[in-house]
C-alpha cells in the first residue's frame, strides 16, 4: 500500500467494464482496507483483519456478515522500532500448528524504511495476541524492494513469504520451519518495468497443478483528493506457475518478471479500484477472491473502502470472477 499522487487534474471515473459479478453481500461493519480473512477452526467464526487502528478486526458467523467490531489486534502498536509502528498495514492471516499467525507491515507512505512483523494467538479473541516483532524481513533505501504487504504460503514442505511494493515489486523469501523468521535471502517473482512499477499486495494460492500469484496494480489510495486517470486506479492481476518459487507467466505466456499479468478484476459498475486482495478456500463456497474497493455510491476516501468478495471459477485454468 504505497500512495502516489496522480498527475490528473480532473476526476475521471474508470470506464465501465462488463462481465464481472457484483461483490457478494456484506452487512454490519463492512469498511476495510487490505483485508485478511480466515475462519476459526473451533467454531467456524469468520475473522476479517484490516489496515489501520493497529490492525482492526471484525468477526461474523458468515462471510456475508453481519460483521461486528472486535477491536485492535495490537492496541499498543508493534515493538518494531520504525516510524509507523503504531499504524500497521496489510495483515495476512494463516493457521499454523494450532496458532493463528498475522503478519503485518510497519512503514510510512513512500518510504523503504519498512519491516514485516508477526503476531500470534490461539483464539483470535481480543487481548489474546502476542507480538513477536520483526521476522527479519526488512528494507531501507539501500534495498531494491520495499518490505511490506506480506503473504504466507506453505508449499512442498516449505513456508514462504511473498512481499513487496513498487521499486522492484514482488519478492519471495523462504521461512524457517516454524515461520517466525526468514531462513535465507529473497528473490524476485514479479516486476513491471514500466512507469512507477506499480505492483504490490501479492497473494499466492494453489489450485490444482498451479500456483497463482495474485497482486494489485495501479494507484491504491487518495482518490478523494486526486483521482487517477481511467485505468490507473487499483486493479487485480494474476500470473501462474507449476512452481511456488518462480517462472510465473500470464495467460499470453509473458513472464511476470517482465510486465506480464492477466486481469482478474477491475473497476466496473459501482465498484472502483478493487485491490488489496487475498484468496480463501471457503468450505461452503469454494475459492473466494476477497478485496477492498470503493463503492461509488458511498465515497472515494480511504476510510470509505468496502469489503468485497466473489467466488472464483478456475475451470479455464485461470481465475474468473
From Swiss-Prot:
Positions marked as site (Important for catalytic activity, responsible for pKa modulation of the active site Glu and correct orientation of both the proton donor and substrate): 149
The protein's enzyme class: hydrolase
Domain of life per record: Eukaryota
Organism per entry: Aspergillus niger
Protein's pathway: Glycan metabolism; L-arabinan degradation
Pfam families for this protein: Glyco_hydro_43
Glycan-bearing residues: 295
Protein function: Its preferred substrate is linear 1,5-alpha-L-arabinan. The enzyme activity is progressively reduced as 1,5-alpha-chains become shorter or more highly substituted.
Reactions this protein catalyses: Endohydrolysis of (1->5)-alpha-arabinofuranosidic linkages in (1->5)-arabinans
Catalytic residues as annotated in Swiss-Prot or TrEMBL: 34 (proton acceptor), 200 (proton donor)
Single GO MF descriptor: arabinan endo-1,5-alpha-L-arabinosidase activity
Induction field: By L-araban, arabinogalactan and L-arabitol.
EC number(s) given by UniProt: 3.2.1.99
Name recorded for this polypeptide: Arabinan endo-1,5-alpha-L-arabinosidase A
Lineage of the species this protein comes from: Eukaryota, Fungi, Dikarya, Ascomycota, Pezizomycotina
Signal peptide: 1-19
Family: Belongs to the glycosyl hydrolase 43 family.
Keywords: Glycoprotein, Glycosidase, Hydrolase, Signal
Glycoprotein as UniProt keyword: yes
Biological processes, Gene Ontology terms: arabinan catabolic process
